[in-house]
């Protein structure tokens, strides 16, 4: 009888220790989670519709002014000029050209690095295609744009979209998807809708 009582008591002590340990671990998890959220708060999203401008760099405004999906023939010419042999690629691609307007609002010359501009859609993001840019420099703008005081300039950049990034059904309707430009993601995400 005493053994059974000791066995029950031992079992209860183990359960109490396990429950207390779980409570302490859970409390530590919650405290850590709150600490991380205070150090790294949720990002704010600043958006602009097509034609609206946002501050890109100090004194430089940017706005999306146009989008063009290249035809198969136009795309083939761009790849050929870039020296890219697409016959060895086992997936489809599309090239989207994005026009952005840069405006220097200062009284001094500005050099604007464009490498920050990314093209995004739900679940996928891509940078300016340097290979296409360099191989077609007469058609596309530079990776660093120079702007005189008060100058406004429309520049064009190519972005390559690959079928392997999407489900087949999504790829069939790729040109119908919503795309946007971003140039900052944290602490503030800045979005230019196309």
Task: Locate the predicted segments by residue.
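Short, Lys/Arg-enriched N-terminal segments with co-localized hydrophobic residues
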Residues: 1-11
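Conserved functional micro-motifs across diverse proteins
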Residues: 9, 13-97, 101-194
């Amino acid at each position: 009888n005493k053994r059974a009582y000791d066995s029950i008591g031992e079992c209860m002590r183990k359960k109490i220790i396990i429950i207390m340990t779980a409570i302490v671990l859970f409390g530590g998890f919650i405290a850590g989670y709150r600490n991380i959220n205070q150090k790294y708060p949720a990002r704010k999203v600043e958006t602009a519709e097509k034609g609206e401008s946002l501050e890109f760099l100090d004194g430089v405004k940017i706005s999306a002014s146009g989008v063009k999906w290249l035809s198969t023939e136009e795309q083939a010419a761009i790849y050929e000029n870039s020296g890219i042999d697409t016959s060895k690629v086992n997936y489809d691609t599309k090239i989207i050209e994005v026009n952005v307007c840069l405006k220097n609002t200062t009284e001094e010359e500005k050099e604007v690095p464009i490498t920050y501009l990314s093209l995004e859609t739900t679940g996928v993001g891509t940078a300016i295609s340097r290979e296409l840019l360099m191989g077609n420099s007469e058609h596309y703008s530079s990776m660093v744009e120079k702007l005189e005081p008060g100058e406004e300039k429309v520049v064009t950049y190519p972005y390559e979209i690959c079928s392997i990034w999407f489900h087949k059904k999504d790829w069939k309707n790729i040109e119908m998807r919503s795309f946007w430009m971003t140039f900052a993601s944290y602490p503030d995400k800045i979005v230019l809708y196309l």
